[in-house]
């Protein structure tokens, strides 16, 4: 392992924990009404007609046709993003790809998938989905309506992902039950909240997911989005009561589809105990796997090799359980 030994942070991004202690972390119990809260939101999201609109993008790629896309989400929010379609193969799979709290300025052309329509939505309030009065920056975004669970922006972002699935099915009806999800950091936490309540998503890949074990998330020092919420908590001590409904680890215990979760031993932006709370919460089914990274949100020796190994692991994961179909995503 090549866990970073030197860094510029005024705290230890390993939090003094070893792989063994991280793997022993258990998810928090669900607050009363957790399932009903999310089931109600999902039911509402299913009533939305996404009305996708497509146009040719200025971006080009030899393997992918690149389209700009917008669709309508809950609260009449317009979500913008990109849709990639294979140039020389049929569309037999769908994939929704989330993003980190830095937003997204372009699609990722290097995902190891084939015969797949890939939708890259921008979360409400960010990048192509900028929406006043939602702050576009991570410290402000994560606080938007935080004291009102029904209106908290994170719930809306989860709904945006569900409606991304609806959008793919509206465009390609034959993709029903053949749509996967990938998300890292912010997008990883959203995925853990979204996947268990949407049975149209057939598997997921989460990378260094945030929002796990909110009590710890509000306690451990960080340079990530939790920092602004920790500051807010000093004058609003009941914020944890609201955030327990948005705990990615609690939600992950309800996941029933194959999962590949990559978590880091060192991470200044998403504390490893919070990441492992999510990964450990995923039920230990046959095709579920945890992939260990030496670090997240930080460059380190061996990072290129580990990222390549994870990419190859993802390639295989996306092909599982698919006789006669070359890619699952």
Regions found by a protein language model. Name each.
Residues 5, 276-329:
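C-terminal catalytic histidine-bearing segment of alpha/beta-hydrolase fold enzymes
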Residues 255-256, 261-263:
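Short beta-strand/loop motif that positions the catalytic acidic residue
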Residues 190-235, 302:
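Hydrolase active-site cap/lid region
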Residues 81-85, 90-102:
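Short beta-strand element of the alpha/beta-hydrolase
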Residues 1-64, 326-329:
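N-terminal targeting or regulatory segments adjacent to alpha/beta-hydrolase or S9 domains
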Residues 265-270:
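Acidic catalytic loop of the alpha/beta-hydrolase fold
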Residues 106, 110, 117-159, 217-218:
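Cap/lid segment of the alpha/beta-hydrolase catalytic domain
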């Amino acid at each position: 392992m090549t866990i970073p030994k030197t860094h510029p942070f005024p705290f230890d991004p390993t939090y003094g924990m070893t792989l063994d202690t991280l793997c022993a972390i258990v998810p928090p119990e669900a607050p009363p009404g957790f399932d009903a809260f999310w089931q109600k939101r999902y039911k509402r999201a299913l009533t939305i007609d996404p009305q996708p609109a497509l146009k040719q993008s200025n971006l080009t790629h030899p393997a992918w046709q690149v389209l700009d896309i917008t669709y309508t989400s809950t609260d009449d929010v317009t979500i913008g993003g990109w849709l990639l379609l294979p140039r020389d193969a049929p569309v037999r799979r769908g994939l929704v790809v989330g993003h980190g709290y830095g937003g997204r300025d372009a699609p990722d052309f290097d995902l190891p998938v084939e015969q797949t329509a890939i939708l890259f939505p921008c979360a409400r309030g960010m990048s192509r989905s900028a929406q006043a009065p939602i702050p576009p920056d991570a410290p402000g975004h994560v606080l938007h309506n935080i004291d009102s669970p029904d209106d908290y922006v994170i719930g809306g972002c989860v709904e945006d992902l569900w409606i991304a699935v609806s959008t793919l099915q509206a465009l390609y009806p034959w993709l029903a039950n053949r749509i996967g999800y990938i998300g890292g950091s912010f997008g990883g936490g959203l995925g853990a909240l979204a996947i268990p309540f949407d049975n149209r998503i057939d598997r997921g890949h989460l990378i260094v997911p945030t929002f796990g074990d909110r009590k710890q998330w509000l306690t451990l020092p960080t340079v990530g989005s939790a920092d602004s919420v920790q500051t807010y908590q000093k004058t609003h001590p009941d914020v944890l009561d609201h955030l327990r409904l948005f705990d990615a680890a609690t939600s992950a215990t309800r996941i029933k589809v194959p999962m590949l979760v990559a978590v880091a031993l060192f991470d200044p932006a998403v504390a490893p105990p919070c990441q492992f709370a999510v990964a450990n919460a995923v039920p230990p089914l046959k095709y579920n796997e945890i992939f260990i990274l030496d670090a997240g949100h930080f460059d380190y020796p061996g990072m290129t090799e580990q990222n390549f190994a994870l990419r190859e692991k993802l390639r295989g994961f996306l092909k599982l359980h698919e006789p006669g179909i070359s890619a699952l995503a």
